[in-house]
Amino acid sequence: ISSVAERTEDSPDVKPYTQETNTEWISVELPPEMKAIQTLLKLSLDERYDTLRKNGIRLAEQQSLSALLRIRQFVLNQNRRSAKPLFTAIRIHYALNILEAHGITSFLKFCERAKIKKGAGVKELFDVDPNFTRAIHLAKDAQSKGIEHSKILKLKEIVESVPGKALIFTSYRDSVDVIFNKLTEMGISAGILIGKSGETGLKQKKQIETVQNFREGLFRVLVATRVGEEGLDISEVNQVIFYDNVPSSIRYIQRRGRTGRKDIGKLVVLIAKNTIDETYYWIGKRKMTAAKSMGDKMTKVLQKNQEIESQKTGLDAFL
């Protein structure tokens, strides 16, 4: 590589073709019912961490899901007695993340699927563990009362604050249905755009039809999973809403790029306080900063190498 070309939104040859995108970060508090469930799940998780530490596994005080996933192979190969608490901890961590970012219904649907799968610790977790079983009981009680994530209550206010079309992104399939149903109940016309996998997935023909209907204004809001981030030709939207955060700078840019093409756009990012949302926010922020500085660093290295090459004389110049 002899040179690197870097472009940002402010580059002279790019700026004429883009519009400003105003970004708003909105923090919400989990409802008390969800906080109670969150506490129980963390207690259940801590029990597994204690067992893993007693078995000689080194864990940080605040253990991430990705860190747990990384030690799976080590446990299977060299510390088999830790397999059950580790895989149970991973299941609990997934459940906790889904609760925090997506809400009651998505959490319960995840638990329903996890319970019927065979695996180490499944029966103990769902039938014996007092904290986890209590968490599920509280979640079902909250669901029966119509309690969902606080983000849902914010959506109507956000969507109606900007006239025109809105695109809502969520990483989790189950929350697409929750968001769609709640918007419909609120009297907001909406459509769904999801991937092709699974029994409930949309085939490509249906995806294209959904996008076309959105473009023609048959509904005002499109709720999409990752399939809406790239590839499909979704028309210009006035507002993009991140229902959840993604720790990927590439996916952040792809989501954000759906607005602010022809006119000034708006991006709204919903963050639940003291949850995985905040963690992903900071991870994403660091990655964005790193990505912006990468081009400059590479250019400086290449310039330095070129200077060294130009200074070579004599025999060195031919080696």
For the regions a language model picked out, list residue spans one by one.
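A short beta-strand element within the Helicase C-terminal
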Residues: 223, 230-245, 265-271
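Helicase motor interdomain insertion/brace
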Residues: 3-15, 33-181, 185
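Switch/connector loops and helix/strand junctions flanking conserved nucleotide-binding motifs
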Residues: 12-17, 36-38, 200-201, 231-234, ...
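Helicase-associated low-complexity regulatory tails and linkers flanking the ATPase motor
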Residues: 289-319
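Conserved segment of the helicase C-terminal RecA-like domain
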Residues: 256-287
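Short glycine-/polar-rich loops that comprise or flank the Walker A/P-loop
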Residues: 1-3, 21-23, 188-189, 235-238, ...
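Short beta-alpha junctions and helix-cap segments that line functional grooves
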Residues: 210, 251-256
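Conserved helicase ATPase core of P-loop NTP-dependent helicases/translocases
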Residues: 165-169, 175-226
